[in-house]
């Protein structure tokens, strides 16, 4: 990682500049939503609420700044760690390619990743923006440990870390799967590029490994969430308007996702 940053100082600086240009305004105002007010007035109660909806990992990170809600400080941490997450993503892509290529292509990542509209709503909430940024870092680090460090202890640590991140935000599961699939596709692409024969067994192994890693990490994260509820004696609950898979018609859930995605990507002006 140090070697990568040393060779790509311009990329690291550019990543910080893009994040600052996108969210730097948050360093100069103290606007926050009503959810943050609830946290200020009922800190313990809000942490228990997160445990009840299956987010004990988010609670664990929140304890890093326990009972301390400084809007400016949390926004600063969020921006710093989001920039670090962007650099880590560049590093992961660089490791996954394994080939000599024009390093300037890496500048595409900080140009579109931190500036994506997907994050604009999330970073409006001071309540969780620091933990969200740190969580992205942990997801990428876990996959680097699993796929790019030969030491088995690090691989095990990476697996446990990946499962832990899924107890922070369930949406990290989709993010992790996307990065894993990218790694697999790059491996297959460069094998074909070098005229290496890939058998059906090799394809099946890579896909099977992906499915096994995804399912096992998800199952372990759910066990962690259940254990946290049991230890803390907290009953399960759900967020308002949360999609309850299996308790509503599947078509209704799909339509909800389509409507939300349409509103997010194609908002009416």
Where are these regions (language model features)?
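Start-transfer (signal-anchor) and selected internal transmembrane alpha helices
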Residues: 1-20
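Perimembrane helix-loop-helix junctions
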Residues: 176-218
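Membrane-interface transmembrane helices that cradle and orient dolichyl/undecaprenyl
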Residues: 139-154, 187-194
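Membrane-lumen/periplasm interface segments of multi-pass, membrane-embedded glycan/lipid transferases
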Residues: 25-73, 207, 211-269
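Membrane-interface alpha helices of multi-pass inner-membrane proteins
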Residues: 154-176, 181
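Transmembrane-helix motifs of polytopic, lipid-linked glycan transferases
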Residues: 79-99, 141-145
């Amino acid at each position: 990682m140090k070697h990568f940053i040393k060779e790509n100082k311009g990329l690291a600086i550019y990543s910080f500049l893009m994040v600052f240009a996108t969210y730097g305004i948050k360093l100069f105002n103290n606007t926050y939503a009503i959810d943050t007010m609830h946290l200020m007035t009922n800190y313990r109660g809000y942490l228990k609420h997160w445990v009840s909806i299956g987010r004990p990992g988010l609670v664990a990170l929140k304890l890093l700044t326990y009972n301390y809600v400084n809007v400016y400080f949390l926004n600063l941490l969020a921006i710093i760690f989001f920039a670090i997450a962007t650099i880590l993503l560049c590093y992961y892509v660089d490791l996954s390619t394994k080939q000599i290529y024009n390093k300037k292509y890496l500048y595409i990542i900080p140009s579109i990743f931190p500036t994506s509209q997907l994050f604009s709503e999330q970073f409006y909430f001071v309540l969780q923006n620091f933990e969200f940024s740190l969580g992205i870092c942990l997801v990428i680090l876990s996959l680097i440990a699993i796929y790019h460090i030969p030491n088995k202890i690090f691989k095990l640590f990476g697996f446990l870390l990946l499962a832990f991140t899924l107890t922070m935000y369930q949406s990290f599961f989709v993010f992790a799967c996307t990065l894993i699939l990218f790694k697999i596709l790059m491996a297959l692409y460069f094998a074909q590029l070098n005229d290496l024969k890939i058998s059906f067994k090799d394809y099946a192994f890579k896909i099977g490994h992906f499915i096994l890693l995804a399912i096992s990490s998800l199952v372990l994260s759910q066990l962690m969430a259940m254990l946290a509820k049991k230890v803390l004696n907290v009953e399960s609950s759900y967020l308002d308007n949360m999609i309850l898979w299996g308790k509503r018609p599947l078509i209704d859930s799909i339509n909800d996702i389509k409507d939300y995605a349409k509103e997010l990507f194609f908002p009416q002006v």
